[in-house]
Amino acid sequence: MHLLPELASHHAVSIPELLVSRDERQARQHVWLKRHPVPLVSFTVVAPGPIKDSEVTRRIFNHGVTALRALAAKQGWQIQEQAALVSASGPEGMLSIAAPARDLKLATIELEHSHPLGRLWDIDVLTPEGEILSRRDYSLPPRSCLLCEQSAAVCARGKTHQLTDLLNRMEALLNDVDACNVN
């Protein structure tokens, strides 16, 4: 299910393309939920700026896939089907996992908090009925910024940081993980 980093498109995505891509992802999720009546993990990379598909985002994605598989194995949860693809919004993964949806969401939240790259992953868990379990459902604060302690949404809306600073931080986190052989 890994993606080959060297095949990244480096396409600068427009807002309309991004919105269409999100609608297409939602449609794929509904098809998967009909095929597998178990929770669905929908996994993407948080990538600031217009380029969502790069060597860096694919490597971050691949680490996330490895971590999700390890999480399922550790918990004894069966992955019924998994797939990876690249859309205008970057690398995407879907895993149908036979596990209680709320337990799965709590475990993925912990993974996002404990893994060095977890802040760069957006891991959604959908119930078999299609409900997206949110961080808010667990009284968790919104994601924090990569560079400061503010809400990431507030910094993004206000364009608080330079894009190059955010991208450099992403790459530094990835290089640290690769240097330490963290999965």
Swiss-Prot record:
Gene Ontology biological-process annotations: prosthetic group biosynthetic process
Domain of life assignment: Bacteria
Gene Ontology molecular functions: holo-citrate lyase synthase activity
**Which is an annotated Pfam family here?**
CitX
Concerning its family, UniProt says: Belongs to the CitX family.
- Swiss-Prot/TrEMBL keywords: Nucleotidyltransferase, Transferase
Q: Which reaction does it catalyse?
A: apo-[citrate lyase ACP] + 2'-(5''-triphospho-alpha-D-ribosyl)-3'-dephospho-CoA = holo-[citrate lyase ACP] + diphosphate
Tell me the organism: Escherichia coli O139:H28 (strain E24377A / ETEC)
Asked if the keyword Secreted belongs to this entry, the reply reads no
The name under which this protein is listed is Apo-citrate lyase phosphoribosyl-dephospho-CoA transferase
EC nos: 2.7.7.61
Which InterPro entries does the UniProt entry name for this protein?
CitX (IPR005551)
Function comment: Transfers 2-(5''-triphosphoribosyl)-3'-dephosphocoenzyme-A on a serine residue to the apo-acyl carrier protein (gamma chain) of the citrate lyase to yield holo-acyl carrier protein.
